């Protein structure tokens, strides 16, 4: 079957913004005007097409990025609606990885907001071209000029309006197109009737000045245009459009548009801009991968239907009707349903059961997907987020996605025995869907610990376990896994002797304990000569030490980074046994605890905090108050980055604290780095607590 839309006429775009900027409503209107839906659903009524999870409709926020496809002006537009909440940045990262362009939605009253900065930085990392849609022009306090100025001040972006609004708030009634110098007036509530009129006299001067600013901003990226501009030559509409398109595709310029999705104004013109200025898969740099067999050898996945098939899986989700759905972006070649492909990341063969074109949560079955398409596959068993899919003879691995480690952990336990198995299944499925969600059983406490990107993230996952998997569970407070070690060396004896009629028990060992290097773990050395401890009992001595070290010597935490050298001992022909030497070794460790200066260690996290410079003082003070050590600072764009080491026990609730300290404009990542000694006063508290004092 031939493709419906050429690659040149395909657009893969994301809609991204701060929470509540009107992103989902904007997507809804796109679907309405492109004929995909017949009734418009409002987010605040909980009936939006793109927000299809129950939790999303309850909270009125977008959690998962629903993918949908629409047609406009002879083009196919694949749209991914991304969440704007900081706890769901992984969804934004996933989407940006597979998009060719994006529409950044701003609230006309607030302009660039904290989460806009975060997603903008992510889009810059992935080199995604953007256009900006200043939404909510009908809102009280809407200010287009202010919104544009925040793009310059907060993002340092080379952005300029390609449209101007006529009026604002209740008076917002028309839009001036600065490229073609036309004016569009809306005449009905649904925004389907638009009159093209002359630019009103009292707005002409303002429009001409804005057009001149637009040409100047674009000319900075285009020598040919700059020459014409400086020579006062006439610049045609076609020349200006081409220059804007080129500069936008090169991520050197960001066109700014205006409208109100809620009141149905400006969305069709924004769709025209998507077609005119955002790139097709042919206009962006082809993705570079490497050979699975030889990571040094680069392979280019060209956007060409006749090339070898290569795609990237960017999202896995469980669908209530068809089971596991794998969303993927095709970079080269084609794929037909029912065929076999290779997951080159995991070196597994997969069969594609069915191929689906997604529309929020409804779907249409298709036979073939082509290069540049975004679709979902049913039947892939081993494929996870970030995996490369390719033809069976191909062995390309596309650059995968890196996801941050969880920053908050909680314990969960099922309320009843019946919930136990269901909870295990639910956790497996949720981890498949979300690479930033981790679950494991703590061997020391036996608790199931879940980790995620923030309180809201885990709150929603626990909620999903309840609603989708019918699992009731209790959520506890998180706990830190401490460790213990020795700071001094000592030689000690461990002797176990018991006579109680009949055969007795006898084992005697002399062991030298010394601190080992950080991270080196436990090392056992046997230096017995002359058989004072028979060879068959040596493994029992080592096993006895290992068992005893699991429970520590101070507060019940595992003892790590210690060397033990068995250098002397004695035995009894009749009474000695493996068990006796095991016990003797554990007694030696108890004795060492009195002489080797044992201490408690805590996990230290490497924390990287990014925020606008004005919050630097507050952040540094907060890090110090949390017993943190600042390791360096560096500027990044118009933000500052602080690197620090902070104890994990001090990092709980940090997301909330950072949000309030930076008015939501800071972001952070953290991961485990090493174990370090706990200050004595805190260690004493831990010991008391664990001994139940």
Curated annotation (Swiss-Prot):
Positions contributing to GTP binding: 17-24, 81-85, 135-138
Annotated compartments: Cytoplasm
Main location class: cytoplasm
The keyword Protein biosynthesis is assigned to this record: yes
SMART domains the UniProt entry points to: EFG_C, EFG_IV
Domain of life: Bacteria
InterPro entries: EFG_II, EFG_III, EFG_III/V, EFG_IV, EFG_V, EFG_V-like, EFTu-like_2, G_TR_CS
Protein purpose: Catalyzes the GTP-dependent ribosomal translocation step during translation elongation. During this step, the ribosome changes from the pre-translocational (PRE) to the post-translocational (POST) state as the newly formed A-site-bound peptidyl-tRNA and P-site-bound deacylated tRNA move to the P and E sites, respectively. Catalyzes the coordinated movement of the two tRNA molecules, the mRNA and conformational changes in the ribosome.
Protein name, entry field: Elongation factor G
Organism: Staphylococcus haemolyticus (strain JCSC1435)
Organism lineage: Bacteria, Bacillati, Bacillota, Bacilli, Bacillales
């Amino acid at each position: 079957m031939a493709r419906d839309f050429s690659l040149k006429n395909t657009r893969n775009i994301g809609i991204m913004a701060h929470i509540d900027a009107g992103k989902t409503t904007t997507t809804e209107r796109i679907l309405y005007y492109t004929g995909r839906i017949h009734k418009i659903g409002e987010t605040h009524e909980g009936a939006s097409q793109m927000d299809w999870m129950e939790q999303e409709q309850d909270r009125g926020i977008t959690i998962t990025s629903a993918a949908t496809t629409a047609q406009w002006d002879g083009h196919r537009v694949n749209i991914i609606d991304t969440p704007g909440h900081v706890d769901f940045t992984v969804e934004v990262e996933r989407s940006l990885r597979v998009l060719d362009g994006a529409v950044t939605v701003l609230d006309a009253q607030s302009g660039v907001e904290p989460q806009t900065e975060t997603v903008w930085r992510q889009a810059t990392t992935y080199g995604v071209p953007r256009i900006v849609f200043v939404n909510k022009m009908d809102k009280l306090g809407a200010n287009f000029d202010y919104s544009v100025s925040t793009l310059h001040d907060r993002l340092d972006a080379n952005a300029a309006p390609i449209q101007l609004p006529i009026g604002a708030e209740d008076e917002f009634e028309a839009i001036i197109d600065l490229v073609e110098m036309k004016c569009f007036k809306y005449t009905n509530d649904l925004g389907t009737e638009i009159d093209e009129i002359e630019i009103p006299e009292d707005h002409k001067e303002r429009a001409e000045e804005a057009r001149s600013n637009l040409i100047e901003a674009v000319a900075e990226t285009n020598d040919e245009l700059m020459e014409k501009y400086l020579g006062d030559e006439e610049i045609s509409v076609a020349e200006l459009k081409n220059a804007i398109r080129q500069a936008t595709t090169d991520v050197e310029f960001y066109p700014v548009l205006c409208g109100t999705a809620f009141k149905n104004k400006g969305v069709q013109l924004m769709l025209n801009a998507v077609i005119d200025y955002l790139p097709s898969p042919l206009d962006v740099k082809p993705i570079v991968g490497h050979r699975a067999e030889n990571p040094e050898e680069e392979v280019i996945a060209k956007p060409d239907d006749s090339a070898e098939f290569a795609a990237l899986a960017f999202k896995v989700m469980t669908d209530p009707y068809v089971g596991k759905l794998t969303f993927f972006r095709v970079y080269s070649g084609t794929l037909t349903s029912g065929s076999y492909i290779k997951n080159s990341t995991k070196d597994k063969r997969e069969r594609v059961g069915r191929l689906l074109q997604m529309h929020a949560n409804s779907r249409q079955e298709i036979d073939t997907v082509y290069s540049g398409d975004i679709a979902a596959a049913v039947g892939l068993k081993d494929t996870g987020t970030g995996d490369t899919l390719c033809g069976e003879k191909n062995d390309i691995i596309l650059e995968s996605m890196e996801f941050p480690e969880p920053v908050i952990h909680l314990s969960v336990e099922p309320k009843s025995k019946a919930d136990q198995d269901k909870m295990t299944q639910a956790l497996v499925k949720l981890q498949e869907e979300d690479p930033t969600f981790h679950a494991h059983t703590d061997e020391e406490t036996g608790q199931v610990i879940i980790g995620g990107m923030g309180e809201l993230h885990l709150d929603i996952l626990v909620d999903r376990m309840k609603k989708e998997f019918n699992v009731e569970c209790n959520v506890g407070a998180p706990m830190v896994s401490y460790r213990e070690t020795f700071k001094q060396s000592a030689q000690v004896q461990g002797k176990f002797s018991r006579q109680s009629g009949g055969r007795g028990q006898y084992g005697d060992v002399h062991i030298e304990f010394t601190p080992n290097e950080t991270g080196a773990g436990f090392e056992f050395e046997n230096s017995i000569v002359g058989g004072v401890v028979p060879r068959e009992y040596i493994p029992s001595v080592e096993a006895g030490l290992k068992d005893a070290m699991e429970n520590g010597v101070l507060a019940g935490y595992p003892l790590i980074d210690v060397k033990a050298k068995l250098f002397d001992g004695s035995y009894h022909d009749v009474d000695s046994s493996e068990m006796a030497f095991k016990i003797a070794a554990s007694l030696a460790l108890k004795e060492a605890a009195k002489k080797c200066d044992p201490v408690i260690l805590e996990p230290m996290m490497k924390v990287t905090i990014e925020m606008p410079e004005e919050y630097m003082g507050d952040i540094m003070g907060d890090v110090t108050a949390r017993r943190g050590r600042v390791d360096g600072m560096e500027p990044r764009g118009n933000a500052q980055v602080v690197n620090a080491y902070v104890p994990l026990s001090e990092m709980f609730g940090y997301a909330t604290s950072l949000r309030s300290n930076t008015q939501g404009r800071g972001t952070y990542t953290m991961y485990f780095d090493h174990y370090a000694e706990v200050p004595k006063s805190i260690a004493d508290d831990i010991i008391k607590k664990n001994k139940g004092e």
